[in-house]
């Protein structure tokens, strides 16, 4: 699905295992400083004390399910996300997923822009 100059079709809701024990990350596009992923969560959350700290700007939309995001260094309270909600997270804005719905898969579309973790500091 990631071949340059090739038309690619897919369905963001295909191949979802509602009983998966681990989150699933599928790369849809990766080139020229842009990464687009489908993420499927089935009740997973960030471990206690863990914060994402990515060198890239992130834009995430929740397409199905429900989730709660927390931000470490902002006045923003934990934010419950429902289908159709999206958030833009600046580079190095420490955040975590504190909850995803265990009864229905949470399907995310994530777009990362900027240096890759190998080029920058990546995740903490």
Features from the language model and the residues they span:
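Short strand-connecting beta-turns/loops that link adjacent beta-strands
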Residues: 33, 74, 102-104
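A short beta-strand-loop-beta hairpin characteristic of the jelly-roll/cupin
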Residues: 53-54, 59-83, 98, 120
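General beta-strand recognition
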Residues: 35, 68-70, 96, 107
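Ligand-binding loop in jelly-roll beta-barrel domains
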Residues: 82, 91-118
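A short, N-terminal "cap"/entry segment at the start of jelly-roll beta-barrel domains
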Residues: 1-51, 123-124
